[in-house]
């Protein structure tokens, strides 16, 4: 796809898929920002992480613990920046018809967001087990991952349907005629 067309589709296009992708990009940027805040604390740029008033949260203690530095000898907040950036890039890649034209993109995005959700939940479990407290910032990022997965799965299912239809020899017109529209989740 030509860059000009991609730019137009991503910025001005209208579809349920693009709406979902925009939400995922926004949630991923939020996750990266949270990773940045935690990373600033973990590297000594800021001295303390304020928490909401609850005994469940002690972000400064959790993010200074052995747990927070146990992967790749790097503060985990800095790793969060990278992983959420990859998710944002996957959400932003491809045009508005990528479930048909590049089905591996929505499938990869769904796989990444589901994996991230499981990892975030596992890390929350580790946080609690080792510290008897949670990082409030990290739990917001966990929610962002869970919502991103919920948004990514319907389009990945459409992409899988398209791949299966292609293998079965159906034309795209037949697939779209038979396809049931997957509406956005409502609150």
Language-model regions, residue ranges each:
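Short amphipathic, positively biased membrane-proximal segments
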Residues: 1-187
């Amino acid at each position: 796809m030509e860059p000009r067309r991609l730019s137009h589709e991503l910025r001005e296009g209208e579809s349920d898929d693009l709406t979902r992708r925009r939400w995922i990009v926004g949630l991923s940027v939020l996750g990266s920002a949270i990773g940045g805040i935690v990373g600033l604390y973990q590297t000594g740029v800021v001295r303390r992480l304020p928490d909401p008033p609850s005994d469940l949260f002690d972000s400064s203690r959790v993010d200074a613990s052995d747990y927070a530095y146990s992967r790749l000898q790097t503060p985990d907040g800095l790793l969060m920046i990278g992983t959420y950036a990859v998710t944002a890039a996957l959400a932003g890649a491809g045009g508005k018809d990528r479930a048909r034209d590049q089905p591996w993109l929505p499938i990869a995005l769904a796989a990444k967001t589901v994996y991230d959700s499981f990892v975030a939940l596992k890390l929350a479990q580790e946080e609690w087990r080792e510290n008897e407290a949670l990082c409030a910032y990290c739990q917001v990022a966990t929610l962002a991952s869970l919502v991103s997965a919920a948004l990514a799965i319907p389009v990945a299912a459409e992409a899988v349907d398209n791949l299966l239809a292609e293998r079965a020899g159906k034309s795209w017109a037949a697939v779209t005629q038979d396809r049931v529209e997957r509406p956005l989740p409502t609150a």
